[in-house]
Amino acid sequence: MYVPETENDWLQIAKDFEIKWQFNHCLGAIDGKHVIIEKPPKSGTLYYNYKGTFSIVLLGIVNANYEFIYVNIGSNGSISDGGVFKHTTFHEKMKSNQLNLPSPSILPQSNVIAPYCFVADNAFAINENLLKPYPRRNLTHDQRIFNYRLSRARRIVENAFGILAERFRVLKRPIQINVHNVPKVVMASCTLHNYLRKKSSNYITRNCVDTEDTETCTFRPGDWRLNDNLVGLNRTERQRTADGNSVRQIFTEYFNNQGRVHFQERMINTMNI
């Protein structure tokens, strides 16, 4: 699995997100899932998660092509979901500027300078390099537009996890092996997912994933959603930062003005955002 190492690597990912999903300056979509395991002997509540099962956590970042560019596997299921990403080496390097992320630059067709960011859902804490949706209560029109535009990019990681579980069905039921070997099984699945994504045109079919028709403004959920067995992280309100809120406001204003797309007004109603 190749983790981007240079600024040019990251810029290529951002270009793909802009072209395919109309989200500028996006470096990847982040999400996490609980991989259900059989309770290890004498482990007490160490792996006991908020859903009442036993698990380890798979945290993943994907590019615009449904490929994993980073995974962290093995946090026990009882850990606070909001703390999973915070305790990864990736997060540590991001906060200490060791990832070679691109410097803030001007957004297309504007004079607005914005940083490059990852996108996630409400299980994660917003900051200057990680954007998440506005909470779904009393949203303004502009906030609904932002949430829709972010959802287009964020759904890529949801679909990557869904396809992963559909193709590697060991992830769809409690894994009954020594808990210390579970991360190896999960890593092998993620690595094979990337390989097959690159090598097989039939690995991901159109019906597998969520699809939008931006001309008719219709949405079709991916087939994996009919049998989604991976438990998501607990989506609770996380601490917000002033920098994170400011960056989100920059993108909100941009997507409602210079960066708007012709279908967004109809789609927020189609998708009830």
Please report, for each region that a protein language model flagged, where it lies by residue.
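Short, polybasic Lys/Arg-rich linear motifs in disordered N-terminal/cytosolic regions
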Residues: M1-I273
